[in-house]
Amino acid sequence: MKLLAMTVLLVTICSLDGALVRRQAEEPDLQGLFSQYFQTVTSYGKDLLQKTKPQDLQAQVQSYFEKTQEQLVPLVKKAGTELFNMLSNMIELKKTQPATA
């Protein structure tokens, strides 16, 4: 019986010591965590900027813009012509209809 009591007492003391050590452990510094996070994000942004090379990116954007413009200008002109023709036909149709009173 004494052996059982000693074992229970020993287990209790060990678990209390463990809990005490966990409470005394320092909590991570949130400000340090945030500064480390922002440093990581900043360095990642710098690396990404160096990898993309702004001149290459600007040239790609310019070529995409030119291709888009080449494709859209004829479509816009055609749509404008068709709209003008439709409005002209509507006006002529109004003129040719007799006035009903």
Swiss-Prot record:
Keyword Nucleotide-binding assigned: no
Family of this protein: Belongs to the apolipoprotein A2 family.
GO cellular component: chylomicron; spherical high-density lipoprotein particle; very-low-density lipoprotein particle
A Pfam family: ApoA-II
Main localisation: secreted
Assembly: Monomer. Interacts with NAXE and NDRG1.
SUPFAM superfamilies, A to Z: Apolipoprotein A-II
SS bonds (residue pairs): none
Keywords, comma-separated and alphabetical: Cleavage on pair of basic residues, HDL, Lipid transport, Oxidation, Phosphoprotein, Pyrrolidone carboxylic acid, Secreted, Signal, Transport
Record's function text: May stabilize HDL (high density lipoprotein) structure by its association with lipids, and affect the HDL metabolism.
UniProt name for this protein: Apolipoprotein A-II
Pyrrolidone carboxylic acid, modified sites: Q24
Single GO BP term: cholesterol efflux
